[in-house]
Curated annotation (Swiss-Prot):
Name the UniProt record assigns to this protein: C-C motif chemokine 8
GO cellular component terms listed in the entry, alphabetical order: extracellular space
Extent of the signal sequence: 1-23
Function comment: Chemotactic factor that attracts monocytes. This protein can bind heparin.
SUPFAM superfamilies: Interleukin 8-like chemokines
GO molecular function terms attached to this record: CCR chemokine receptor binding; chemokine activity; heparin binding; phospholipase activator activity; protein kinase activity
Source organism: Canis lupus familiaris (Dog)
Length: 99
């Protein structure tokens, strides 16, 4: 009887602690997109639709993810001149489309 009472107390304590941990906002797992390899060659500009910068501290390196019109995502090095030029072009294109 003493053993089952002790076990019940232990389980209740563990359950209350796990509820506390799950209620913490930092314990929520948010999916993170990271790039582990970069494209080596230029992508044809006419195939691109948009881009997204990846600067998350949990990723091994900074990157730019270009999204193509075919919905593919391609990682590129933001330090490369052509990548910067493409980002500027896409920014100007999106500004021109806004009324």
């Amino acid at each position: 009887m003493k053993f089952s009472t002790a076990l019940l107390c232990l389980l209740l304590t563990a359950a209350s602690f796990s509820t506390f941990v799950l209620a913490q906002p930092d314990s929520v797992s948010i999916p993170i997109t990271c790039c582990f390899s970069m494209v080596k060659r230029k992508i044809p500009m006419q195939k691109l639709e948009s881009y997204m910068r990846i600067t998350n501290s949990q990723c091994p390196q900074e990157a730019v993810i270009f999204k193509t019109k075919a919905s593919r995502e391609i990682c590129a090095d933001p330090k490369q001149k052509w990548v910067q030029d493409y980002m500027n072009h896409l920014d100007q294109k999106s500004q021109a489309q806004k009324p």
